[in-house]
Regions:
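Short helix-loop capping/hinge segments that flank enzyme active sites or metal/cofactor-binding pockets
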Residues: 6-63, 113-122
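Short, surface-exposed loop/helix-turn segments at secondary-structure junctions
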Residues: 2-4, 8, 79-100
Length: 158
């Protein structure tokens, strides 16, 4: 989590602000506001180089783990889907740790619905494969989707 946040905010949030401006964004989500606030000052090139070295070590560790497996199956997030309007708490960011962990590798993954909470909100599973094995991630995602019923529209309430 620290590596991801360090890289995402290494420029003091200027890159995010630039993208928001290019997109014509007038209002941002509370989590984006929190990330921009946490950005602080731009970090040094040496600091960023150290973070990328940690990413390389992390990728090597993950690749060693995957020597014995074709795919990792894991939750998408540490929490089930949130009800609309409840994700404004910046303290929820650690719940995205499963997604962030695999985003750091840059490796292929597929996310599919595997069920639903009692309220009808979807629960997902992600399949993450080795580098350059999109075919494996997509095949596993396709199999899971077929076996578990695929996309089902959640109930919409006002």
């Amino acid at each position: 989590m620290d590596i991801f946040m360090g890289i995402a905010t290494a420029d003091g949030g200027e890159g995010l602000r630039m993208l928001l401006g290019m997109a014509g964004t007038k209002r941002t989500h509370a989590l984006m506001d929190a990330m921009l606030t946490m950005s602080g000052e731009a970090k040094s090139a040496a600091f960023l180089q150290g973070l990328w070295a940690q990413v390389s070590i992390y990728r090597g560790t993950m690749l060693s783990f995957l020597k014995n497996y074709d795919v990792i199956l894991c939750p998408v997030n540490a929490l089930p889907a949130l009800e609309h309007g409840t994700s404004f708490n910046p303290g929820i960011v650690p719940a995205f740790s499963y997604t962030i962990a695999h985003n750091l590798t840059g490796w292929p993954g597929a996310v599919v619905r595997c069920g639903a909470r009692s309220e009808g909100l979807p629960v997902g599973v992600q399949a993450v494969a080795r580098p350059w094995r999109e075919d494996v991630a997509l095949a596993v995602g396709n199999h899971l989707e077929a076996a578990l019923g695929g996309y089902q529209r959640p109930p919409l309430t006002a």
